[in-house]
């Protein structure tokens, strides 16, 4: 394969990966699995996972869980739902897995976040609150609880 053909194929693969990533962003609360996402990209599951990680720096499942945790943070800040209700609202089927991943990304359990965030972003524009409370990817959360005020 010539270099121009390889470059064109690489661009087509990136476009397919982008469409799948957009689908994850839209349908994060639906049951999604790597095999179905790979079929959407016309790739095998293994190849899709490798290419997705190369393009976006994390696995498809990791990206999906990050989207779910970001949405869960918004729901917990808004209030009105319990941690369990938020867990199921964002598409997680296991409260344990949800709590573990939430703690890895945010640095505190969802129940603690819910208690702290309830008043911390009050009066703050939502666009600012989202940036201040955005999770850190790839298990880089600080050990100490973040200051939300």
Predicted feature descriptions by range:
Residues 62-64:
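Short, basic-rich loop-to-helix N-cap that marks the start of a DNA-contacting helix
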